[in-house]
Amino acid sequence: AHGTELLEIARQRQVNFQFEASVGGGIPIIRPLYRCLMGERILEITGILNGTTNYILTKMDKEGASFNGALKEAQDLGYAERNPEADVEGHDTCRKIAILTAMATKKEVNYQDIYTEGITKITDIDFKYAAKMGTSIKLFGSSRMEADQVFAWVAPVMIGREHPLYSVSDVYNGILVRGNMLGTTMYYGSGAGKLPTASAVVADIIEEAGHLDNHVSLGWSSEKLDIAPMEISCHKYFVRVSGPYEPKKQLIEQCFGSCQIMTLEGLNECALLTEKMSEKQFKEALFELEEKLGGMYQEVLQTIRAQL
């Protein structure tokens, strides 16, 4: 929250402010953005940026654990705090994608402007559908830089096996950076723990030792970056609805158009995967569906964004 202020103090005092360990634990990402990719125009950054939530989601995916059960195990192992809100509600990931977006755009990013949704509503049933679809669910922090707009958000996302971040499991982090010339590069490694973080801190100390007599303008300016409204961001959506599919087939098609429909044996519900649409269009269609389901004593059980 005070990154811009600290960078300005460092500039005024002609000293250096290093913060490699602020994102990704031991993964080098701040310095690559500043040095190795300095000739690139960064178009997109998407990552699994929180080891705690990734551990929880991995347990739910691979072992069928409940959210509460996986969270307790993470706490017992020291991966999650006694008060895990910053992790599971997505706030930690939000602050990290804000830092990466600021590095990419060279402008100040207020993390409070970034749409943020955590993993507390994800259930073991969601993962059963994901397994049937050949997908998984990950908590993403993402920013996309277009000609006149910057989109940034944090949310659980359903991804397929072909996605580069599909196999990033447990407390590991993975970050994709797409540039205008190089294309996509991936940064992967341990995103939590004292030794990975210590590795990044020591690297900063060594870096600083090479610049004792000069100021390195690492970071961003005080100019504020405007984040585009989430309503115009486009995704596919996974939706679970109570009750059998057949009586609702026409209703679902009226609201969402062509959809992929699926069911799980033994459950009195169905799920659908929409085509790509804006957040605003999805909310309007969802509201219409919920209104009509109310008369049938049925309800929407879950919604998750998808990159499929």
Predicted features by range, described:
Residues A1-R35:
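Rossmann-fold NAD(P)-binding glycine/threonine-rich loop
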Residues I9-A10, A74, A130, L251-F256, ...:
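A generic structural signal for well-ordered alpha-helical segments
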Residues G24, P28, E40, K62-G69, ...:
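Conserved active-site and cofactor/substrate-binding residues in soluble primary-metabolism enzymes
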Residues Y34-R95, L100:
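Conserved anion/nucleotide-ligand pocket segment
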Residues E44-T46, N54-L57, E73, Y79-N83, ...:
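Catalytic, metal-anchored helix/loop core of enzyme active sites in primary metabolism
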Residues E63-S66, A104-Y111, A209-D213:
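Short helix-capping/linker segments at secondary-structure and domain boundaries
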Residues L71-S167, Y172-G174, G193:
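Substrate-binding/catalytic subdomain of NAD(P)-dependent oxidoreductase enzymes
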Residues I205-L308:
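A conserved regulatory-domain signal marking ACT and ACT-like small-molecule sensing domains
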